[in-house]
Amino acid sequence: MAFANLRKVLISDSLDPCCRKILQDGGLQVVEKQNLSKEELIAELQDCEGLIVRSATKVTSDIINAAEKLQVVGRAGTGVDNVDLEAATRKGILVMNTPNGNSLSAAELTCGMIMCLARQIPQAAASMKDGKWERKKFMGTELNGKVLGILGLGRIGREVATRMQSFGMKTIGYDPIISPEVSASFGVQQLPLEQIWPLCDFITVHTPLLPSTTGLLNDSTFAQCKKGVCVVNCARGGIVDEGALLRALQSGQCAGAALDVFTEEPPRDRALVNHENVISCPHLGASTKEAQSRCGEEIALQFVDMVKGKALAGVVNAQALASIFCPHTKPWVSLAKALGALMQAWAGSPKGAIQVVTQGSSLKNSGSCLAPAVIIGLLKDASQQSNVNLVNAMLLVKEAGLDVTTSHNPATPREQDFGECLLTVALAGAPYQAVGLVQGTKPVLQALNGAVFRPEVPLHPGQPLLMFRAQASNPAMLPTMIGLLAEAGVQLLSYQSSVVSDGETWHVMSISSLLPSLAPWKPHVTEAFQFCF
């Protein structure tokens, strides 16, 4: 999945010129058009495989479903809440961002907001412009010794922590993913949220906008906070409940707030913006020359590396895909697709649980990318799932009535000596199991239901294979099968058979084209199927 057919990219928001240049130097056509309406954006995307946006363009499900050629959406920045991830994933469209591009700029703005809240700098400056000299009105507070609560300890959160520690602030925080040991390494003590609220003099949020983070600061949590707490939101509008914040400001429970983001941008309700203890900016978190250049450069390089098959970085909705660009993994992905297609042809649109088992040290962490490849083989022939790919496979397989489990078996000492790795695909509770491996860079089939092929059967993309099981004691069987091929006008290209298992043998014929029907074969064999992947 090297996205080799991605040729044209639309940039629909203002980006640094380096973005266009890098894309063009990488062999891609680039169109730059900003401030497009929904209808105009859909029209422009009809001949584009790629789209790069900042935060202004809203990539909705309507746009995604109408953009027939679209394969990749790139967000030059961190947050992707302006992209409908579910719709993109369902359609098999990759979504990527630049998680590092604006981290420093967002962190520096947050630190500036904290300092402005402590010393009321914007209010004092505005007073001076009005010709006033109000020294007593703008009495501030030192940051030294104050407690800063940081909710979200990713890249931006930790940059804020290290900077504010230099002011003598004590930093505490919460993050459901970052471990306490990791956060302690950059000076943040993690505590449960209910313990954080009453301790903080300042609270800053650095989380994505999710159902679990929407309204994270609300009437209930403000009531638990220390009276006079100051709040900063340079992350996403909606994390702080704006109605609750206004009530806390009016009651004095919250002494001040600094907001760079809002639930609605620009906000039509000006009550918060106009409050004397609120500092507000028009979403400037990433608005520095350095961040814009960095984000534009990073997303362009990610597109070019992806198209050339070098690497896949910044993936939001299919992280496991990054490993398919590893030279070791590519042939295993091809093998997984082949075994999935084999299983679909053999079991006849199976239902239930599909088991994907890896074996061998080099495949220890490969199940997450091989399972979607197996699903592609399983679902590709189903007309309603013809668009299945590595992005949407795990979503579509559930709708097809299948559960997919992955597991790993460590290699035995003997297998470790020989470096043998295996991929097994099986249908739980049914007699369908296929085992394959990679020889050099070539996928091969090793066994079906324990019947081993020696030598293994090559699995070439686009090469039809006919497989059937029959009694090993029937010497007339093979001439009969060859005769049936001739009657159908199909050439036999190669032939292999397995060792005898339970008195029967599996036979594999590489043929020039798929047979129109297997009905003539059924009286002569125990079972038969054909497939091509």
Swiss-Prot record:
It comes from Bos taurus (Bovine). Gene3D superfamilies: D-3-phosphoglycerate dehydrogenase, domain 3, NAD(P)-binding Rossmann-like Domain. Catalyzes the reversible oxidation of 3-phospho-D-glycerate to 3-phosphonooxypyruvate, the first step of the phosphorylated L-serine biosynthesis pathway. Also catalyzes the reversible oxidation of 2-hydroxyglutarate to 2-oxoglutarate and the reversible oxidation of (S)-malate to oxaloacetate. The active site is at R236, E265, H283. The modification Phosphoserine is found at S14. Keywords: Acetylation, Amino-acid biosynthesis, Isopeptide bond, NAD, Oxidoreductase, Phosphoprotein, Serine biosynthesis, Ubl conjugation. The modification N-acetylalanine is found at A2. NAD(+) binds at T78, R155, I156, D175, T207, C234, A235, R236, D260, H283, L284, G285, A286. There is a cross-link at K21 (Glycyl lysine isopeptide (Lys-Gly) (interchain with G-Cter in SUMO2)). The modification Phosphothreonine is found at T78. This is D-3-phosphoglycerate dehydrogenase. One of its GO terms (biological process) is L-serine biosynthetic process. It is an enzyme of class 1 (oxidoreductase). Homotetramer. Pathway: Amino-acid biosynthesis; L-serine biosynthesis; L-serine from 3-phospho-D-glycerate: step 1/3. It catalyses: (2R)-3-phosphoglycerate + NAD(+) = 3-phosphooxypyruvate + NADH + H(+); (R)-2-hydroxyglutarate + NAD(+) = 2-oxoglutarate + NADH + H(+); (S)-malate + NAD(+) = oxaloacetate + NADH + H(+). There is a cross-link at K21 (Glycyl lysine isopeptide (Lys-Gly) (interchain with G-Cter in SUMO1)). Its EC number is 1.1.1.95, 1.1.1.399, 1.1.1.37. PANTHER family: D-3-PHOSPHOGLYCERATE DEHYDROGENASE, FORMATE DEHYDROGENASE 1.
